[in-house]
Amino acid sequence: MLCRSCAGWLRSLPTLRLPAPGSPPAWSSARLPALPVWAAASVSAASPGGWYEALAASAPVRTAEEVLLGAQEATGLPWWSNIILSTVALRGAVTLPLAAYQHYILAKVENLQPEIKDIAKRLNQEVAVCARQFGWSKRVARLTYLKNMRRLISELYVRDNCHPFKATVLVWVQLPMWVFISVALRNLSTGATHSDGISVQEQLAAGGTLWFPDLTAVDSTWILPVSVGVVNLLIVEIFALQKIGTSRFQMYVTNFVRAVSVLMIPVAATVPSALVLYWLCSSLMGLAQNLLLRSPGFRQLCRIPPSKSDSETPYRDLSAAFCAKFLSRKR
C-alpha cells in the first residue's frame, strides 16, 4: 500500500521540462620572409591532402574570404579598418543575439533550482520509505533516486523549454566562425587564395596602421599579441568572479582557459598581424558583450527573466569583487 502511494506520488508530480545536461591553394612565398622561418614553414609544409590544406581550401573558409573581400570593396576602407569593421559587424549580428539567448536559457534554469531542490527532498523521503519497506540496498535506493530525479528534472526542462544544452549554441557557432575567419585571413596574408591572392596580399602589406603598417608581417613589438592575451585573461577573470561556490571541475576548466589565454601570446607573435588584429577585435567585442549582458536594462530589453543572481548595480559589484580578489592581496 505504501509503495503504491509512493509510486502514485511520483507520477503525480508536476510535469517538468528539464534537459539532459576544392583544389589546393597555390602557396606564394613572395611575402613569407616577413614571418619567422618556422612559422612560415608551418603554413607551406602542409602536404597535399593534409588537414590544414583541406581546411584552408574548404567552402566555409572560401566564404569567409569572399565576405572580407566584399566588405573591403564595398567600403573602400584600408584593410585594418575593414578587419575591425567586419569583426564588429559579425559579432554584433551573430554572436550577440546568441549570447542573449544563452543568458535567457541560463536564467530560466537558475529559476528552476528552488523547485528542483524541493522535488529532490520529497523524492529522497519517498525512496527512503520504499527502501525500508522492501529492504533495498543503499545502491538500489541510490540508483532509484537518481533515475527518477533525472526524469523529473528532464520534465521540468521540457515544461519551461530551457534545456541547458540550448545554452551551448553560442559555442557551436562562435568557435567555427573564429576558425574560418582566422584561416581566411591567413590565406589572404600569405597569398594562398584565389588568382588575385597576390594582389590582395600586397594590399594587406600596405593596409596596416600605427606600429603595424604591414598586416602580412608579425608584430615585432608584441603589442598586439600581449593585448590579445590580456583581454582574454580579463574575460576569464570576469567570468570567474561571477561564479560563487564553483566545483572542482569548473576550477579546472577556468585554469585551463587561463593557460590557453597565456599561450595565445607567443602564438600570436608568430602569425601575420592581420590575424592578431582580428583576434584582438574579437576578444574586445567579447568583453564588451559580456559587460553589456550584465546591464539590467539590456537584459530587460532582451526579455531575459530576472534571477536571484541578478544585481541592480552589476558594474559596481564587479569592480568591488575585482578589487577584493586582486588588489587586496597586494596590501
Curated annotation (Swiss-Prot):
Name of the featured protein: Cytochrome c oxidase assembly protein COX18, mitochondrial
Similarity section: Belongs to the OXA1/ALB3/YidC family.
Annotated transmembrane regions: 165-185, 221-241, 260-280
Keyword Membrane (UniProt): yes
Organism from which the protein derives: Mus musculus
Cited function: Mitochondrial membrane insertase required for the translocation of the C-terminus of cytochrome c oxidase subunit II (MT-CO2/COX2) across the mitochondrial inner membrane. Plays a role in MT-CO2/COX2 maturation following the COX20-mediated stabilization of newly synthesized MT-CO2/COX2 protein and before the action of the metallochaperones SCO1/2. Essential for the assembly and stability of the mitochondrial respiratory chain complex IV (also known as cytochrome c oxidase).
GO cellular component, one term: mitochondrial inner membrane
Signal peptide: none
Topological domains, Mitochondrial matrix: 186-220, 281-331
Mitochondrial intermembrane side: 64-164, 242-259
Topology of this chain in the membrane: Multi-pass membrane protein
Location in the cell: Mitochondrion inner membrane
Gene designation: Cox18
Biological process per Gene Ontology, one example term: protein insertion into mitochondrial membrane
Keywords: Membrane, Mitochondrion, Mitochondrion inner membrane, Transit peptide, Transmembrane, Transmembrane helix
Transit peptide: 1-63
Assembly mode: Found in a complex with TMEM177, COA6, MT-CO2/COX2, COX20, SCO1 and SCO2. Interacts transiently with MT-CO2/COX2 during its maturation. Interacts with COX20 in a MT-CO2/COX2-dependent manner.
Primary localisation category: mitochondrion
Entry-linked InterPro entries: YidC/ALB3/OXA1/COX18, YidC/Oxa/ALB_C
Entry GO MF terms: membrane insertase activity
